[in-house]
């Protein structure tokens, strides 16, 4: 046939049996990839420290998606929340991976069957004897079935009526676990951070899909609409399907990057905006302030800060810090976090508490500046020592740690003080193991960043695909050069070109 690579799909254009076959094969490939990727991730995943080395630090991509749907246990005897388990049941991580691989194999066989037995009676128009598909009817069937699946997920799986529920956590990502969720039918259901909205929206959308599917099964489209939207052309289906996919991809890119109840920070890592807004820092200071109000010492108040909360308040966990072409997990960048050193409090020789100005997201380097409670610069690490007025040595800055591994330890040696001031620019200070994975010290993005980049990129590509195929199907007659109003019979093999009076005609 000699088709160029970008036109090979025309071989299934008027062949419904093999069109079905290649779609089943595509499903086999997707499902097979998902199952295989899950097994690979499980082979390299270390579940030993869910606080300082969670799945998103290790670059896991499919494990978080399984976990948010209620899978938490492994046949290896571990649980994602830490600790060991004795009876994980069939729906463990490995069980889900295996189910995808088995399903992939069945789809593979079905694809081969439909490729061989392509000329089925069901695809044949009894009036003409030619292969054809009743596309509006197929649309109704698919809408109905997807509505049933959507409703079932929201009404049974998410609510725990028949299923585990979904991953639910607090606003600071500390207490996450899988639990049933009640639908939120009020205005709060439209808050993207309210899990109840997931249940109610799936129930509502599923109900709408079921009703719309039944409508399209029982009502035929008007002839003018059928012709105007080219409902008899398979390329119309391709165009509108691409539209649905790119729209969904844009939506999920947004919910992933900006955060939502569907993308918990315990599974995908924090968002960049939580660093930009000092979200975790404010909560930490609020908790310390509450402790001090209860007559706790600074050391006691800081010691009660969960290590998990302190770890979120570290710039290395910001997904916007990784470069687009820096491959690998976060652990391959700044290393595996081993422990929290504690919160450093800097003071000058007059006893004023100083705060290190934190590095903004898009800076690779940033001057070390220490300000007092009023925002007045009191100390810095100067670029030119000859002109310095606020150097650590001149101001006499000291540092003392509260909470963490260095609790109660203080330093007055300028070199050490400057070292910790530099590290305090990056948020809370952690001991990081860079030897185990030969980490290079350059920040990486989390799966949150990869997912967003991938889906936004493909959504843009698919948007152009929608425009392309939509234009092709709507203006097919124009592109082919056939007059749409032509009713005279034209000689076979010679098409009437628009405005061409020389085309041979024959009287019927």
Swiss-Prot record:
Residues passing through the membrane, by range: 21-36, 101-115, 140-156, 203-218, 237-252, 457-472
Topological category with respect to the lipid bilayer: Multi-pass membrane protein
InterPro entries assigned to the protein according to its UniProt record, in alphabetical order: PS_antenna-like (IPR000932), PS_II_antenna-like_sf (IPR036001), PSII_PsbB (IPR017486)
GO CC, alphabetical: chloroplast thylakoid membrane; photosystem II
Gene Ontology process terms (BP): photosynthetic electron transport in photosystem II
Molecular function (Gene Ontology), one example: electron transporter, transferring electrons within the cyclic electron transport pathway of photosynthesis activity
SUPFAM superfamilies in the record: Photosystem II antenna protein-like
Free-text remark on how the cofactor is bound: Binds multiple chlorophylls. PSII binds additional chlorophylls, carotenoids and specific lipids.
Subcellular localization(s) per the UniProt record: Plastid, Chloroplast thylakoid membrane
Top-level taxon: Eukaryota
This protein's UniProt keywords: Chlorophyll, Chloroplast, Chromophore, Membrane, Photosynthesis, Photosystem II, Plastid, Thylakoid, Transmembrane, Transmembrane helix
Gene3D superfamilies the UniProt entry points to: Photosystem II CP47 reaction center protein
Record function comment: One of the components of the core complex of photosystem II (PSII). It binds chlorophyll and helps catalyze the primary light-induced photochemical processes of PSII. PSII is a light-driven water:plastoquinone oxidoreductase, using light energy to abstract electrons from H(2)O, generating O(2) and a proton gradient subsequently used for ATP formation.
PANTHER family according to UniProt: PHOTOSYSTEM II CP43 REACTION CENTER PROTEIN, PHOTOSYSTEM II CP47 REACTION CENTER PROTEIN
Family membership: Belongs to the PsbB/PsbC family. PsbB subfamily.
Quaternary structure and partners: PSII is composed of 1 copy each of membrane proteins PsbA, PsbB, PsbC, PsbD, PsbE, PsbF, PsbH, PsbI, PsbJ, PsbK, PsbL, PsbM, PsbT, PsbX, PsbY, PsbZ, Psb30/Ycf12, at least 3 peripheral proteins of the oxygen-evolving complex and a large number of cofactors. It forms dimeric complexes.
UniProt-recorded name of the protein: Photosystem II CP47 reaction center protein
Gene from which this protein is expressed: psbB
